Amino acid sequence: MQGTKIRLLAGSLLMLASAGYVQADALQPDPAWQQGTLANGLQWQVLATPQRPSDRIEVRLQVNTGSLTESTQQSGFSHAIPRIALTQSGGLDAAQARSLWQQGFDPKRPMPPVIVSYDSTLYSLSLPNNRNDLLKEALTYLANVSGKLTITPETVNHALSSEDMVATWPADTKEGWWRYRLKGSALLGHDPAEPLKQPVDAAKIQAFYEKWYTPDAMTLIVVGNIDARSVAEQINKTFGTLKGKRETPAPVPTLSPLRAESVSIMTDAVRQDRLSIMWDTPWQPIRESAALLRYWQADLAREALFWHIQQELTKNNAKDIGLGFDCRVLFLRAQCAINIESPNDKLNTNLSLVANELAKVRDKGLSEEEFTALVAQKNLELQKLFATYARTDTDILTGQRMRSLQNQVVDIAPEQYQKLRQNFLNSLTVDMLNQNLRQQLSQEMALILLQPQGEPEFNMKALKATWDEIMVPATAAAVEADEAHPEVTETPAAQ
């Protein structure tokens, strides 16, 4: 789904955005992933993982439709259809269907059976390993969901009277920060959690289902210790009979650029004040090697920035401050934030501490020693690449693949990744990294304060004044310098 966070953790290695380096060559997909398109347009991708024989078999069916395809009178249709699906046996007998859902749930990593968002609906099953019978039943069930649902007044009423097991992304579509972020976007009027309008017309839900649940708008993913060839044959046999074709393209979800404002938002999502220094840029797909320089340089610069600030706060024995950093792609907007967890009465002081470090890095850059230590750490991670890959379970591999598809990233093989990443690290210099940091830190940034419900609203003008006093004069100078040297004005894509 959209909005997946990427946290910078010691020793982590992001396999998601693998890409080539230097020449602008098209990237070659990892051949370990078998993939194809059926005659009816359904796309499938299968990864056999013999290195993980005990892992569960992960199955995902993504339908490219969500609440954004609904008209006002159709509100709630995209949420109602999977509710109906979950109350039907999907071409199995009732006992088989019950058994499938009981066993198709990973107790260690519980995941909703269906997640509905603005532009997609994701059906998920996690099956015990070595159960080819269950995998066959899962494919039968999902094929039935894809084009053979029984939608009548009786089945609709039965679904609505049953427990709602369908989740939304985001989980709370009415949360204050999320509603703020959607300002200026068509998404605001298309809530995937919206209930059906009364009275319910089953015939209209059926028409919506037939229009948007077409095989040419579906992607099926299977990952696990399986016989990939046999599974591909099962997919062709089970899903090949589905009918229908999209006659109307689905609307493309878009977000407005993040406004460089200072705002306070009351929310149940936090228990302590969280101030986010936030910026965003258009996300650039990674399909060819020229994208590597932009992505990897920007990504490594952000990681270096985070570790620098954290080390400086530790060195100065800073109290009552928690620091976090996350980046995510939201509908092809790449958004990053430095998050400051702080008591209410120390917000201004803690913002000042962080802003001063940001200004120092922007104006003076990282030291040669910091750069050398960072590259050494990245080289160490690279040496452990294959061990890391071997420890990556099927659930993680599946999630990474879903994100790659969502964000238009070509996954390459670990062997190629290792070679290209090594070349990248060998070619990187402290000056290249510092120029990237200057570019990123010279952007206008938003100050977003999330406060627990019931807390007195904080004076954001005071925070903005603190920020401007430290950051703005040099930012303005940097912008003027960039205008004089247009060859360095492009800000690399963030993730």
Curated annotation (Swiss-Prot):
PANTHER family: NARDILYSIN, PROTEIN YHJJ. The keyword Protease applies. The keyword Zinc applies. Residues 1-24 form the signal peptide. It comes from the Bacteria. Keywords: Hydrolase, Metalloprotease, Periplasm, Protease, Signal, Zinc. Has lost the active site residues. It is found in: Periplasm. It holds the Pfam family Peptidase_M16. This is Protein YhjJ. InterPro entries: Metalloenz_LuxS/M16, Pept_M16_N, Peptidase_M16, Peptidase_M16_C. One of its GO terms (molecular function) is metallopeptidase activity. The gene is yhjJ. Belongs to the peptidase M16 family. GO terms for biological process: proteolysis. Its main location: periplasm. GO terms for cellular component: periplasmic space.
